[in-house]
UniProtKB/Swiss-Prot annotation:
Family: Belongs to the tyrosinase family. Hemocyanin subfamily.
Cofactor: binding details: Binds 2 copper ions per heterodimer.
Cross-link entry 2'-(S-cysteinyl)-histidine (Cys-His), positions: 19-21, 131-133
Keyword Transport listed: yes
Subunit description: Decamers of large identical subunits (390 kDa), each containing 8 globular oxygen-binding functional units.
Name of the featured protein: Hemocyanin, units E and F
Amino acid sequence: HGLPAQCPNADGTMVHTCCLHGMPTFKLNFDSHFTIKTVVAQNGTELPESILPEATIDRIPPSSHDLESVRGNLVRKNVDRLSLQEVNSLVHALKRMQKDRSSDGFESIACFHALPPLCPNPTAKHRYACCLHGMATFPQWHRLYVVQFEQSLNRHGATVGVPYTDWTYPMKEVPHLLTSEKYTDPFTAVETFNPFNHGHLSLLSPET
């Protein structure tokens, strides 16, 4: 497998390791086409060629194929470490999400978290909040809820995951992304409302 070099035989004038680590000696690469004719064991015994079957190809890959677009997992970053581009993508994604009135929109997902009570269904006589606050299974439920919110943000154009605040570090104020009522796009200089500060929920009030 390695040293000392003993191939093709230990007494040869030009010996090399018996493993394929010595391929450069023969000016071979791993994609070179070659056939092993002689195998010499560590003790110098020459092994017959029949011991190693002829190499075969189990699968011939296609010369070309369609590439399936796959989006990777989103990275969740500390809110204080977001770049201008990342904040910009989050703000515009949340704005689009708030305008979406489908089940993938902000209002539908936000209401599912608490009020108004919509479970077991919106038309039931006795309804309750769909969240599991105060229950032992709340952590598991909330993890899935954050993923649902995050995936919706991504489908609406966010390039990063839901940002977080690191509670292990002292913090003197709430992040500016949440407290500022206005947001100025650093690339267009257009000032609009900040969707992370307030938004529209028709089932509760005009602005929340």
